[in-house]
Amino acid sequence: MASTVVAVGLTIAAAGFAGRYALQAMKHMEPQVKQVFQSLPKTAFSGGYYRGGFEPKMTKREAALILGVSPTANKAKIRDAHRRIMLLNHPDKGGSPYIAAKINEAKDLLEGQAKK
């Protein structure tokens, strides 16, 4: 019983010393870490999606971003992208009616300008 208490006490003391050493080491490395983060490109942390709301009048570029296709995509690719996105965002399955309307508007805009 006494040896267990001593072992636990030594373990706690060792953890305390290790934590103190780690904090001191981090203080010395702080300028280097800041320099590394400043040298990274700003887009590294921006995420992989378009940040911004919808434009008042939908453009071809915005429609392509919504559907995830090229602005010059053919009708088959536009239909496939529309179907895939609507399966995920359909209002009958808990999706937003506003988002569904924007997806449909994007499909209509791109299909009107796409080649067969």
UniProtKB/Swiss-Prot annotation:
Q: Which residues carry this modification: Phosphoserine?
A: 39, 70
S-S pairs:
none
Side Mitochondrial intermembrane, residues = 2-3
**Short name of any one Pfam family annotated for the protein:** DnaJ
Q: Name one GO biological process term.
A: regulation of cardiolipin metabolic process
> Molecular function terms in GO for this entry?
ATPase activator activity
Mapped to this chain, the residue ranges on the Mitochondrial matrix side of the membrane are 25-116
Chief location: mitochondrion
Name its cellular compartments: Mitochondrion inner membrane
User: Mind telling me which SMART domains this protein's record contains?
Assistant: DnaJ
Q: Which residues form the J domain?
A: 62-116
Positions of modified residues (N-acetylalanine): 2
List all membrane-crossing ranges.
4-24
PANTHER family, per database record? MITOCHONDRIAL IMPORT INNER MEMBRANE TRANSLOCASE SUBUNIT TIM14, PTHR12763
Of which family is this protein a member?
A: Belongs to the TIM14 family.
Oligomeric form and interacting partners = Interacts with PHB2; the interaction associates DNAJC19 with the prohibitin complex. Interacts with TIMM16/PAM16. May be a component of the PAM complex at least composed of a mitochondrial HSP70 protein, GRPEL1 or GRPEL2, TIMM44, TIMM16/PAM16 and TIMM14/DNAJC19.
Q: What is this protein called?
A: Mitochondrial import inner membrane translocase subunit TIM14
Q: From what organism does this protein derive?
A: Bos taurus
Q: What is the lineage of its organism?
A: Eukaryota, Metazoa, Chordata, Craniata, Vertebrata
Q: Which gene encodes it?
A: DNAJC19
